[in-house]
Amino acid sequence: MANIDLSQYGITGTTGILHNPSYKTLFEEETKEGLTGYEQGQVSELGAVNVKTGIFTGRSPKDKFIVDDETSHDTVWWDSEDYHNDNHRATPETWNALKEIAKKELSNKKLYVVDAFCGANKDTRMAVRFIVEVAWQAHFVTNMFIQPTEEELANFKPDFVVYNASKAKVENYKELGLHSETAVVFNLTSREQVIINTWYGGEMKKGMFSMMNYFLPLKGIAAMHCSANTDKQGQNTAIFFGLSGTGKTTLSTDPKRLLIGDDEHGWDDEGVFNFEGGCYAKVINLDMESEPDIYGAIKRNALLENVTLDDKGNIDFADKTITENTRVSYPIDHIKGTVKGFVNDKSAAPAAKSVIFLSADAFGVLPPVSILTPEQTKYYFLSGFTAKLAGTERGITEPTPTFSACFGQAFLELHPTKYAEELVKKMEANGTKAYLVNTGWNGSGKRISIKDTRGIIDAIHSGAIKKAPTKKIPFFNLEVPTELEGVDTNILDPKDTYANPADWEAKAKDLAQRFIKNFDKYTKNNEAGKALVAAGPQL
């Protein structure tokens, strides 16, 4: 039991505190006899413990609030009629009431306190203290954040405190101006987060990502929802942006290269660095052959979420009974081939040479690869486009577009143009090139092959794409290579994949119109946004 005083936070009468417990202790605590409900962990055949998170098997965006005070009022990108997002306003009075609920829930209990860092660079990292009453929640943040050394722990002074009161409820939520009995609320002045009535671990992970997304760009550091890797010498860094289903994880996990991280990164004057100390991978339909790295990472100390196990601990990765969003969190050293431990002692590498935007275009319009200008980089970054095929009631499959600012709108606390400015500033200072890669469909009706996409990514890493002959395609005015080693030449111009080129033109005009309509929101009262219209599609 630790010698740590929580009365400074208004938490009193604790019956015991486990401070940064070891994995062995966490395993014992989350599987011990007598635990019931969602506190109870079940040991799987692979050694990892599986837990259930109740009705919340993902984040609850409608229940995310930020205290509207002098710190946040003029800086936060608030939810508005013009542009809906997840940054809902809470009053200081509501904050005080919610913190009281959390303090009451956490008082007179045995608690777990985990002190950890968010950010691999010492100058800009955030020291976070997590106060929780559930053992597996302590395990989750131990996996996902960067663990301090013994010396760092002895001198730990938190920059941010998270109170996880998942067992409590906000019964008077209506009078507090909330949407439900659940609340995930941030106070940027006191640097605290309160979580009430949701057990989902990702609220702590993405909560701290949102805070890095607030504080870092204000210091001139790019904060990014992306994966990143580098070559075996740790010098040729690449960043991959992309929404779910675009191949971000698949393409950044490359046996020829070293992984920096799979989800959250910053870019400062030293280079690109991971915010996290672990990975949080989807495991629905996980297969040992196709994703050996993730499968191999599921062992003791990994934590499975909402996966179906039988009485003997056998895992059914195909079972969606609880959710399709089944997950595993594990420390990054469960993966072979990472920068940390291979090139240096942290998940970081020099400035990126390539920035890759991944879009799975189900309209069949975008080229497999386009070379972007700085203005186009900002435009397509702010657009954050992908599309998926959705079946309609008549069995016709129609593309559904998704536009998510900066490929991570849910986690942006500042206006999207701020993230675009910081990214392009870093790119211009380092001579970084940006590419738009379509991992979706073309006129053949088939998805662009993973072989061709990997050939494109290899040509970007090697620099071969910079020497390739190019041409411009109409409406989008994108520069595309006309030949590229290891890639089928016939697919490089999407128009060539259509039996009738007029079909591509009709679809291109339709998609261009969707981009234009989506971008309109950036032009309202925003000169930076207006200036970028010319970089987008023109009709």
Swiss-Prot record:
GO cellular component terms, A-Z: cytosol
Sorted UniProt keywords: ATP-binding, Cytoplasm, Decarboxylase, Gluconeogenesis, Lyase, Manganese, Metal-binding, Nucleotide-binding
Its main localization is cytoplasm
Which GO BP annotation is one of this protein's?
gluconeogenesis
Task: Note how many cofactor molecules are bound and how.
Answer: Binds 1 Mn(2+) ion per subunit.
* Gene Ontology terms for molecular function: ATP binding; metal ion binding; phosphoenolpyruvate carboxykinase (ATP) activity
Q: Where does ATP bind?
A: 206, 225, 242-250, 291, 327, 447-448, 453
The EC number of this protein is 4.1.1.49
In this chain, Mn(2+) is annotated as bound at K206, H225, D263
Query: Which pathway does it serve?
Result: Carbohydrate biosynthesis; gluconeogenesis
Q: Which cofactor does it need?
A: Mn(2+)
Residue intervals passing through the bilayer: none
Q: Which residues bind substrate?
A: R59, Y200, K206, R327
Q: Which reaction does it catalyse?
A: oxaloacetate + ATP = phosphoenolpyruvate + ADP + CO2
Localization recorded for this chain is: Cytoplasm
Q: What does this protein do?
A: Involved in the gluconeogenesis. Catalyzes the conversion of oxaloacetate (OAA) to phosphoenolpyruvate (PEP) through direct phosphoryl transfer between the nucleoside triphosphate and OAA.
Name the protein family. Belongs to the phosphoenolpyruvate carboxykinase (ATP) family.
Protein name as annotated = Phosphoenolpyruvate carboxykinase (ATP)
* Organism for this UniProt entry: Selenomonas ruminantium
Originating gene: pckA
